[in-house]
């Protein structure tokens, strides 16, 4: 100990003494703990003293004081630790015990909220210690140090024990033994710990466990909540094994202890270890839930399924009339019941269903308060639950539209299912057997007011439906009144109250949320009245949020306005700006959640924007797409994958979560902001084949800015690029010649310039150039040049590539030249007649155009209209156009609209409808320039 200058003693325990010392080598104060001199000759006690130091040294956590040095060869043995200024939790509790009134600062220090944050840190430390296989065995306020700078550390590891170790012979209990020289320390043969903090089973001699540490934490929590012990006894007296502990709420009503925290404390203090928390993590999570303001559910009412007085409306309905997308038989009748009570702003419903009821199908709805008597019960949100072939499916419905679905296999012998639905703030969750199956976020004030149930046989509900209410948070309560006005469409009154809240909470979350909802109210009002000025006013209110901590809400609000106006380019632009500018802002999660919602909304309504939102979701929130949804999305994209040149030329399967999928979605949607990121990724990997794919997509979409910027970058770096074995498909300098060909196509230069370096180009690049050239030549009335191009490049590609990619264009060229015999011969010699009738084959449209050229137009329309309507490939879109039902071009993606215009162009040309044909050229060029989503 000669190295240290002892300043003063700061503590004394059973085996050791703690001194404040100065370390001149490190120029710092330390806490030095040494074994008591009168015990230094006891080898067993010395071993225990060093074990305490080694256990603490092995733990690395902010809640454990680290050990600097351990000196086991000195006399006496000692170890050093950082010196933390502060006081024990016991001294703080002692300062307020049995005090009628407290000074303001002490009242704040010992408030329930302050103590909870301390207790959460204690739990975090014990959770870590347990994860390392260590039991403390003597958790109590004496052993918890509160630093002056918010440190919370656990002291005294003398009783600590590895869970793998058995109880030692030398055990201790914190009870003095009169007349013994060891009166303040471990007594051989006794139980380790302090009786007031020991679990009942521990007092009976049961070995220590995580559960006994949890019990000690329960006593500490009880003291923090009530400022008193859960039971009273004098040390040394016999402790009852069966004791009744009063609820903290009853003991200290003046402390305003939330019922939830009382339940937490009582669960930790349960006499039966099986009833206690299974781990410290579970206890900590409950405390964390309260600290974060998460809902704490308490039962409020019960809906008796078979009692008429609980229901405002009960009638039979044909479910298929209101929810046609659920695939329910049109002849099946279901019972609909709408509750008399209105649900709370935050509500949880709990019920148990028989398997039979789920096999028939069960719906739980949150319809609006108004209009339920007039058939509007399907408005708002709800869940449809169904079991078929031991697969449990859950569909989220909104306004009668299925916007999301998930399915999972279940056990064949399972007959009952516990279901819970939670509505909390912007979150709607469905829980099955205590597992979250689906979460949906909606940041607009909810319209749901009542509770609706759809079922075939009410006896399939086991018991009743329990309605639980959450205590909620300040934000929800202060916004509840204007939200209610908004739900009742009293827009002006809602705006008045929102404005008051915004003015009352400047710079705070509540104020920003109120400002956001002012814009929402104006948007709803404008949508209902059709007032264009109202949309402008809503945009203005959202702009007030600019550069605030809630800045992402400005762009979310604007996106909602543009969505309502049908200005989808501006909608997506707003969302992208938010993601780019505020990626670190907490509110950005609302943008991500909205994008995922829009993906489901557009996909299930077959909207062309679904590809854009799928691309956005893959880029920013891939984890939000589960395996079932992924399978559904890939199935929907199958036709597009088949009709994509860079997918056909690369036979490797396309993974949904790959960069290639992002490129595919960019190509079909015409949405190019992610192309620079894909370029950078492939450039870093030196994947020149993938780079060629990116440049082909940019060229096809007419993104000249990207082509010029990044082709120059490639040219500048080609000379310094070292060709290695990794470059397996083609050399980087081939890209330079590809760029020259693309530029020649855009300038309508002669064919020889487009394919000037064909002899050194890889066939993939040749086919990319040909595809770009052929489409440009055909739509601009130069279809005959396609034949010249084929003659030039035919010898550089394989026979299979000729058949798949050149032959269809050769037929198109002869259709343009109206050479009916040549077209017919090419069809007969290269395609079986069965393929002429297969809309998945290129021959289907080519044959239809040949019929338009040589036969009556009605025959060509009849042929083309024979295409399948359920899964129409992009290569056969003209078939949908010719069908009696027609095709909704507004639902087609950017690339589908271009393909349809090309097909209509050659079809009208063959029919001799030159004006309609020329209109297609104008529309094609305009679409390429505007590239509207």
Curated annotation (Swiss-Prot):
**Record PANTHER family:** MITOGEN-ACTIVATED PROTEIN KINASE KINASE KINASE 20-RELATED, SERINE_THREONINE-PROTEIN KINASE YBDM-RELATED
Catalytic residue positions: 138 (proton acceptor)
Q: State the name under which the record lists this protein.
A: Serine/threonine-protein kinase PknD
Query: Locate the Protein kinase domain: which residues?
Result: 4-291
Source taxonomy lineage? Bacteria, Pseudomonadati, Chlamydiota, Chlamydiia, Chlamydiales
Keyword Ion transport among record annotations: no
> What does the UniProt PTM comment say about this protein?
Autophosphorylated on serine and threonine residues.
The gene coding this protein = pknD
S-S bonds: none
Which CDD domains does this chain map to? STKc_PknB_like
List the keywords (alphabetical): ATP-binding, Kinase, Nucleotide-binding, Phosphoprotein, Serine/threonine-protein kinase, Transferase
Q: Which SUPFAM superfamilies match?
A: Protein kinase-like (PK-like)
For binding ATP, which residues are annotated in this chain's numbering? 10-18, 33
Q: Which reaction does it catalyse?
A: L-seryl-[protein] + ATP = O-phospho-L-seryl-[protein] + ADP + H(+); L-threonyl-[protein] + ATP = O-phospho-L-threonyl-[protein] + ADP + H(+)
What NCBIfam families does the database record attribute to this sequence? PRK13184.1 (NF009651)
Q: Which InterPro entries match?
A: Kinase-like_dom_sf (IPR011009), Prot_kinase_dom (IPR000719), Protein_kinase_ATP_BS (IPR017441), Ser/Thr_kinase_AS (IPR008271), Ser/Thr_kinase_PknD (IPR023507), TPR-like_helical_dom_sf (IPR011990)
Q: Known Gene3D superfamilies for this protein?
A: Phosphorylase Kinase, domain 1 (3.30.200.20), Tetratricopeptide repeat domain (1.25.40.10), Transferase(Phosphotransferase) domain 1 (1.10.510.10)
Q: Does the keyword ATP-binding apply?
A: yes
Source taxon at top rank: Bacteria
Similarity comment: family membership: Belongs to the protein kinase superfamily. Ser/Thr protein kinase family.
Q: What is its EC number?
A: 2.7.11.1
Enzymatic class: transferase
Q: Which GO terms describe its molecular function?
A: ATP binding; protein serine kinase activity; protein serine/threonine kinase activity
């Amino acid at each position: 100990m000669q190295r240290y200058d002892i300043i003063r003693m700061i503590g004394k325990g059973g085996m050791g003494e703690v001194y404040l010392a100065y370390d001149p080598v490190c120029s710092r104060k330390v806490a030095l703990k040494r074994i008591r001199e009168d015990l230094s000759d006891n080898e067993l006690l010395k071993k225990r003293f060093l074990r305490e130091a080694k256990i603490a040294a092995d733990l690395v956590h902010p809640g454990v004081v680290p050990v600097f040095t351990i000196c086991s060869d000195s006399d006496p043995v000692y170890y050093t630790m950082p010196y933390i200024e502060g006081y024990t939790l016991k001294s703080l509790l002692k300062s307020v015990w049995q005090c009628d009134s407290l000074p303001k600062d002490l009242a704040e220090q010992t408030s329930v909220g302050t103590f909870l944050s301390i207790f959460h840190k204690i739990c975090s430390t014990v959770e870590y210690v347990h994860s390392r296989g260590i039991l403390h065995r003597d958790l109590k306020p004496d052993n918890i140090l509160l630093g002056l700078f918010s440190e919370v550390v656990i002291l005294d590891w003398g009783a600590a024990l590895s869970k793998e170790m058995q109880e030692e012979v030398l055990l201790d209990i914190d009870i003095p033994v009169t007349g013994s020289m060891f009166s303040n320390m471990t007594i051989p043969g006794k139980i380790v710990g302090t009786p007031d903090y020991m679990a009942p089973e521990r007092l009976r001699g049961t070995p220590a466990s995580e559960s006994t540490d949890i019990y000690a934490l329960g006593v500490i929590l009880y003291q923090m909540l009530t400022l008193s012990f859960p039971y009273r006894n004098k040390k040394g007296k016999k402790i009852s094994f069966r004791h009744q502990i009063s609820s903290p709420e009853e003991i200290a009503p003046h402390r305003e202890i939330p019922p939830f925290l009382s339940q937490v404390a009582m669960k930790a203090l349960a006499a039966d270890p099986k009833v206690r928390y299974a781990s410290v993590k579970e206890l900590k999570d409950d405390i964390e839930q309260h600290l974060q303001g998460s809902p704490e559910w308490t039962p409020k009412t019960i809906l008796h399924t078979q009692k008429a007085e609980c229901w405002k409306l009960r009638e039979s309905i044909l479910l298929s009339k209101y929810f046609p997308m659920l695939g329910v038989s049109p002849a099946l009748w279901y019972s609909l019941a709408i509750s008399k009570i209105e649900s709370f702003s935050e509500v949880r419903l709990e019920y148990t269903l028989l398997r039979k009821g789920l096999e028939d199908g069960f719906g739980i709805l949150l319809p609006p308060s108004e209009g339920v008597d007039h058939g509007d019960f399907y408005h708002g949100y709800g869940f449809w639950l169904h079991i078929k072939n031991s697969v449990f499916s859950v569909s989220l419905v909104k306004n009668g539209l299925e916007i999301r679905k998930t399915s999972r296999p279940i056990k064949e012998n399972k007959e009952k299912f516990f279901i819970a639905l939670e509505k909390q703030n912007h979150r709607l969750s469905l829980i099955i057997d205590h597992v979250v199956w689906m979460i949906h976020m909606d940041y607009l004030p909810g319209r749901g007011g009542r509770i609706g149930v759809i079922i075939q046989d009410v006896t399939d509900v086991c018991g009743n439906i329990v309605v639980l209410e959450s205590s909620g948070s300040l934000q929800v309560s202060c916004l509840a009144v204007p939200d209610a006005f908004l739900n009742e469409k009293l827009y002006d009154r809602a705006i008045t109250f929102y404005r008051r809240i915004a003015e009352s909470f400047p710079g705070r979350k509540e104020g920003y949320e109120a400002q956001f909802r002012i814009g929402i109210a104006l948007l709803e009002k404008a949508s209902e009245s059709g007032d264009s000025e109202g949309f402008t006013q809503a945009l203005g209110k959202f702009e007030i949020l600019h550069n605030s901590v809630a800045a992402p809400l400005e762009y979310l609000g604007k996106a909602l306005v543009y969505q309502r106006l049908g200005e989808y380019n501006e909608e997506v632009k707003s969302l992208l700006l938010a993601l780019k500018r505020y990626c670190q802002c907490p509110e950005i999660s609302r943008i991500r959640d909205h994008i995922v919602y829009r993906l489901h909304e557009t996909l299930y309504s077959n909207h062309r924007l679904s590809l854009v939102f799928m691309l956005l979701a893959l880029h920013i929130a891939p984890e939000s797409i589960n395996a079932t949804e992924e399978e559904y999305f890939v199935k929907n994209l199958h036709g597009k994958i088949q009709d994509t040149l860079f997918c056909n030329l690369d036979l490797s399967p396309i993974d949904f979560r790959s960069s290639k999928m992002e490129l595919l979605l960019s190509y079909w949607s015409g949405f190019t902001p992610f192309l620079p990121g894909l370029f950078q990724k492939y450039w870093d990997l030196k994947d020149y084949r993938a780079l060629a794919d990116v440049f082909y997509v940019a060229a096809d979409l007419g993104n000249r800015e990207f082509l010029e910027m990044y082709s120059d970058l490639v040219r500048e770096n080609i000379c310094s690029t070292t060709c290695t074995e990794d470059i397996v498909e083609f050399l980087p300098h081939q890209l330079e010649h590809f760029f020259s060909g693309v530029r020649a196509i855009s300038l309508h230069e002669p064919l020889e310039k487009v394919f000037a370096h064909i002899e050194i180009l890889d066939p993939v690049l040749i086919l990319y150039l040909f595809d770009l050239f052929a489409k440009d030549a055909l739509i601009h009335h130069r279809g005959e040049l396609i034949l010249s191009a084929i003659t030039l490049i035919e010898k550089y590609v394989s026979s299979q590539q000729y058949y798949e990619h050149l032959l269809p264009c050769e037929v198109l060229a002869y259709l343009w030249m109206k050479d009916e015999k040549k077209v017919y011969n090419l069809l007969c010699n290269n395609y079986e007649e069965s393929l002429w009738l297969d809309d998945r084959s290129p021959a289907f449209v080519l044959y239809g155009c040949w019929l338009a050229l040589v036969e009556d137009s009605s025959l060509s329309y009849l042929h083309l209209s024979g295409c399948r309507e359920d899964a129409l490939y992009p290569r056969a879109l003209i078939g949908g156009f010719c069908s009696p039902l027609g095709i909704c071009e507004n639902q087609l993606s950017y690339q589908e609209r271009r393909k349809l215009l090309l097909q209509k162009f050659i079809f009208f040309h063959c029919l001799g409808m030159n004006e309609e044909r020329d209109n297609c050229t104008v529309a094609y060029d305009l679409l390429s320039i505007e590239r509207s989503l």
